[in-house]
């Protein structure tokens, strides 16, 4: 099975549920140490993905700007499970995600309390991995009862 076939069968819901179940098991088995391991793993995963994105941008002769961070994203929601819009361009580029397939998957399976750890760490570390000089301010996230995922670059 090639990467595309795997991606078609293992989509957002499967990723979300797998992540949340790992967090749940680590908390139940190891308490705070399990929680810390999940945080550290999510940070490392985000930074590694960000670095891969940066390498592709640099290979193409592009700079590591916030714009190119968005253009070189590794993950595309082909099925449109999430809804993200540009909220503002100035003074800062801001996006609002008003419906999140990850969050909805965690809710569907009763795993929101475990999955929301992902939201606390992944995006900031994707940005840091892409370019440590870029800053992402996360003002709210759906999985933590925010009105939307409010990201300001």
Predicted regions and their residues:
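N-terminal accessory segment detector
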Residues: 1-93, 101-118, 129, 134-148
């Amino acid at each position: 099975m090639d990467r595309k076939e795997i991606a078609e069968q293992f989509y957002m819901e499967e990723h979300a549920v797998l992540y949340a179940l790992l967090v749940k098991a680590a908390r139940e088995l190891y308490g705070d140490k399990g929680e810390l391991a999940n945080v550290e793993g999510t940070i490392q995963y985000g930074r590694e993905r960000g670095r891969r994105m940066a390498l592709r941008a640099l290979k193409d002769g592009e700079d590591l700007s916030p714009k190119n961070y968005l253009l070189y994203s590794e993950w595309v929601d082909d099925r449109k499970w999430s809804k993200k819009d540009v909220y503002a361009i100035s003074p800062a580029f801001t996006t609002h995600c008003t419906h999140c397939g990850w969050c909805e998957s965690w809710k569907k399976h009763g795993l929101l309390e475990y999955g929301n750890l992902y939201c606390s760490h992944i995006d900031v570390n994707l940005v840091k991995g892409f370019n440590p000089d870029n800053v992402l301010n996360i003002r709210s996230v759906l999985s933590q009862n925010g009105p939307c995922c409010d990201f300001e670059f």
